[in-house]
């Protein structure tokens, strides 16, 4: 049987142009308040990203993805690791990729493609800031951020994935049945989002 790993190599980074100082990430995850006082919780952003993903999939006549708590744990651990060690990539500084993280988390994914092949998982990443004034997408588009609430953060994350061909293909892959979303928020307001599929 052929194993096919879906690995979107181009990680999407929402770059913050105005009013955002470059700071090292905090070493612990925080719950952040934006300038207007809205509390941004990692779990609420994860839930809202999941809802937004399923809204978009429904628009494309695709089945919704079930929430998988174990896969969410794998995703959360990766987001927290990126925050803690100050990187943004599918592979950790030690070379661990999403399939190794699945294995370490005790998660096995085998989504049939045919009688002879299957997918073993997939991953999308996003890095954004809930106080950003301008977002620069991977495709070069610059748009006013204008988001303050967790729902607006979730919408911007999913919109960013939809404007990146590899991330879009992952998000709209009809074979996926479930996903886990993991979110970590740094003291500087940066938000790391990992989306893992099976």
Report the location of each language-model feature:
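Bacterial N-terminal signal peptides that target proteins for export
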Residues: 1-10
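Short, low-complexity, Pro/Ser/Thr/Gly-rich segments in the mature regions of secreted, periplasmic
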Residues: 188-198
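Bacterial Sec signal peptide processing site at the extreme N-terminus
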Residues: 21-31
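Short, well-ordered surface patches within globular domains
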Residues: 29, 40-109, 168, 174-180, ...
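A well-ordered secondary-structure block
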Residues: 98-187
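Bacterial N-terminal signal peptides
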Residues: 9-19
């Amino acid at each position: 049987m052929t194993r096919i790993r879906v690995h979107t190599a181009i990680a999407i980074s929402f770059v913050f142009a105005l009013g955002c100082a470059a700071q090292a990430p905090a070493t612990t995850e925080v719950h952040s308040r934006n300038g207007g006082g809205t509390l941004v919780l990692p779990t609420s952003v994860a839930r809202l990203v999941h809802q937004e993903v399923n809204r978009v999939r429904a628009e494309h006549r695709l089945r919704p993805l079930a929430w998988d708590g174990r896969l969410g744990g794998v995703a959360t651990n990766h987001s927290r690791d990126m925050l803690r060690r100050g990187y943004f990539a599918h592979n950790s500084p030690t070379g661990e990729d999403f399939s190794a993280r699945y294995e370490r988390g005790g998660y096995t994914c085998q989504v049939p493609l045919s009688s002879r092949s299957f997918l073993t998982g997939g991953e999308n990443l996003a890095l954004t800031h809930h106080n950003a004034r301008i977002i620069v997408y991977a495709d070069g588009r610059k748009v006013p951020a204008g988001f303050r609430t967790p729902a607006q953060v979730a919408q911007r994350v999913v919109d960013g994935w939809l404007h990146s061909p590899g991330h879009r293909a992952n998000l709209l892959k009809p074979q996926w049945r479930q996903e886990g979303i993991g979110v970590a928020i740094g003291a500087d307001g940066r938000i790391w989002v990992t989306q893992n599929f099976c």
